[in-house]
Amino acid sequence: MKASILRSVRSAVSRSSSSNRLLSRSFATESVPERKVAVLGAAGGIGQPLALLMKLNPLVSKLALYDIAGTPGVAADVGHVNTRSEVTGYVGEEQLGKALEGSDVVIIPAGVPRKPGMTRDDLFNINAGIVKSLCTAIAKYCPNALINMISNPVNSTVPIAAEVFKKAGTYDEKKLFGVTTLDVVRAKTFYAGKANVPVAEVNVPVIGGHAGITILPLFSQATPRANLSDDTIVALTKRTQDGGTEVVEAKAGKGSATLSMAYAGALFADACLKGLNGVPDVVECSFVQSTVTELPFFASKVKLGKNGVESVLDLGPLSDFEKEGLEKLKPELKASIEKGIQFANAN
């Protein structure tokens, strides 16, 4: 499914009558339950392409697009795409409740983007407040929805969301996800290039967090297997960790990793929808409440089901390099988690 999304879009461009083929190849099956997805921050750099990709997903029957401005235009534009879902735009805080009501999945790409020289933590003061406000509304209007957190720094915004939901009495650790899928997408792409294997066949788990050294791709577990040198593995790991910076610098101050993030967000949302619909053996990496390490939140492989997280999978065997990386990331990840918790409880 994952590798076929972009092929399907290209197919649709060349054959205007192929919309049904597009859908069947892009995302899953057509005979599915009614599912509402809300995108909060839908007029932004990630939100707009993400809205389009969710419109292409036949598992979605209602698509609610929310932002503080600009969503009526985005909704009108995306709404003309001839696919199953009904699209509605909502603008301003007074319409947030309507956007959220009845949602099965809420995707949150809201917030300010990275700029040259900025780290994800530089975004904290602005995005933390945005996330807290949105999660307060989620707790009120759709407390049972699966939450897909994209807003950075994810290592802190997921703990913020958890604290908001705890205070509201609605917290369910099985329903809160930090979307780290872009790290997996990058790791697969970079590995395929070095291993000279088809990227569609590649699988690479990525654990830890979603910023800098907290991102730890497990290339020792990558498939198909390839005999890569230690230096190559180190370089691949570094490039995966710095992937966001690579895009920010390439765009020369005019954007961040919006398109690839939208793609990754759409992949993870699709996995959540499949899990909700009872599709078996849906496994993705995500930053969730976890006991696989001593840290309260951690990214690893997660099995998705009808209630969200069905199980958090073990890390599996690690190479010596990965064991070292795991120990190095823990202090930074712990500090980011605590920063989010402190923000939520102090404001």
From Swiss-Prot:
Which region of this protein is its transit peptide?
1-27
Q: What are the record's GO terms for cellular component? A: mitochondrial matrix
Extract the InterPro entries matched here: L-lactate/malate_DH (IPR001557), Lactate/malate_DH_C (IPR022383), Lactate/malate_DH_N (IPR001236), Lactate_DH/Glyco_Ohase_4_C (IPR015955), Malate_DH_AS (IPR001252), Malate_DH_type1 (IPR010097), NAD(P)-bd_dom_sf (IPR036291)
Mind listing the GO biological process terms from this record? malate metabolic process; tricarboxylic acid cycle
List positions binding substrate: R114, R120, N152, R186
Please tell me whether the keyword Transmembrane helix is annotated for this protein. no
Binding residue positions for NAD(+):
G41, A42, A43, G44, G45, I46, G47, D67, N127, I150, S151, N152, M261
| Location relative to the cell | Mitochondrion matrix
Active-site residues, as the UniProt record annotates them = H210
Keyword rRNA processing in the entry? The reply is no
Q: How does it assemble?
A: Homodimer.
Please give the PANTHER family that the UniProt record associates with this protein: MALATE AND LACTATE DEHYDROGENASE, MALATE DEHYDROGENASE 1, MITOCHONDRIAL-RELATED
Family that this chain belongs to: Belongs to the LDH/MDH superfamily. MDH type 1 family.
UniProt name for this protein: Malate dehydrogenase, mitochondrial
Q: Which organism is it from?
A: Citrullus lanatus (Watermelon)
Which gene underlies this protein?
MMDH
